[in-house]
């Protein structure tokens, strides 16, 4: 049995915490009755060891062991820095 590590891409929406950030993951879901695709957003708390991310950055994250009550994801890399 293979254990595939889950990786996702999202945009940083908050970086006010020390060594933590909130990443919004957007996905499209088809409505079961009408068939229209609806945008859904999931917010995940992510561990950022070096505080290298800012608001608006596009990041890649991966699932890990629970680090706190709400954090079980860690930063892999910054895909794109936000334009300030």
Swiss-Prot record:
Q: Which residue windows are coiled coil?
A: none
For this UniProt record, give its keywords in alphabetical order, as a comma-separated list. Answer: Ribonucleoprotein, Ribosomal protein, RNA-binding, rRNA-binding
Superkingdom per UniProt: Bacteria
| One GO-annotated biological process of the protein | translation
An example GO CC term for this entry is:
cytosolic small ribosomal subunit
Q: Could you tell me which PROSITE patterns the record lists for this protein?
A: RIBOSOMAL_S17
Which GO MF term does the entry hold, naming one? rRNA binding
Question: Record's InterPro entries?
Answer: NA-bd_OB-fold, Ribosomal_uS17, Ribosomal_uS17_bact/chlr, Ribosomal_uS17_CS
Q: Which cysteines does the record link by disulfide bonds?
A: none
> What does the protein in this record do?
One of the primary rRNA binding proteins, it binds specifically to the 5'-end of 16S ribosomal RNA.
Oligomeric state and interaction partners are given as: Part of the 30S ribosomal subunit.
- Please report which protein family the annotation says this sequence is part of: Belongs to the universal ribosomal protein uS17 family.
Task: State what protein this is by name.
Answer: Small ribosomal subunit protein uS17
Species name: Pectobacterium atrosepticum (strain SCRI 1043 / ATCC BAA-672)
